[in-house]
Amino acid sequence: MSEKATEIANLLGPTVESLGLELLGVEYLPAPGGATLRLYIDVPLAEQPDRIINVDDCERVSREVSAQLDVEDPISGNYTLEVSSPGVDRPLFTLDQFARHVGESAKIVLKLAQDGRRRFQGQIVRIDTEAAAVVFSVDGKDVQIGFDNIDKARILPDWVALGLAPQKPNKPGPKKPGHDKKKPSNEPAAGKPRAE
């Protein structure tokens, strides 16, 4: 998270927790016409998977943090507040969140290039707490990336495990009218003499 996003997360985290929810992270996206402030919330880990975030949870958090933001005023200028569940491609904001998803695949964008690249996709292998780093398996080899160098990270959903993988049809679908391929015949077209 950016410094501004971290500042806002520290400010709003206790408010979200007072509602019985967890603030996973904050995205602060400044823009000339007005910034976007996006909060990702979830139910506490102890309540998963029995309970999931719903629209009512997002509305409650939005009302409470809107009032707090009006009083504290950490953002100068206009902004749009968005409160969202993390979704199946959940963003990862902390080392603890990476640790919860060891064994899953993720895609990450780095602040500074490592090994000539800024984008990586691979399986989260382990967390190196001493080095404050995440170890990924990328193209068959382990790559250690410092947590401070991770700009953005998201889980890559396993669509097959979720039962949402697109199904390939076993047979071709119905033909559309007018798309029948006719075999050429040696018969001349109606009303036309045969060329010899």
From Swiss-Prot:
Primary localisation category: cytoplasm
Annotated localization: Cytoplasm
InterPro entries in the cross-refs: Ribosome_maturation_RimP, RimP_C, RimP_C_sf, RimP_N, RimP_N_sf
Keyword Plastid among record annotations: no
Start-end of Basic residues biased regions: 173-182
Any GO BP: ribosomal small subunit assembly
GO cellular component annotations of the record: cytosol
Pfam families: DUF150_C (PF17384), RimP_N (PF02576)
Gene3D superfamilies xrefs: Ribosome maturation factor RimP, C-terminal domain, RimP-like superfamily, N-terminal
Keywords: Cytoplasm, Ribosome biogenesis
Region Disordered, annotated ranges: 164-196
Protein task: Required for maturation of 30S ribosomal subunits.
Family of this protein: Belongs to the RimP family.
Entry protein name: Ribosome maturation factor RimP
Species classification: Bacteria, Pseudomonadati, Pseudomonadota, Gammaproteobacteria, Lysobacterales
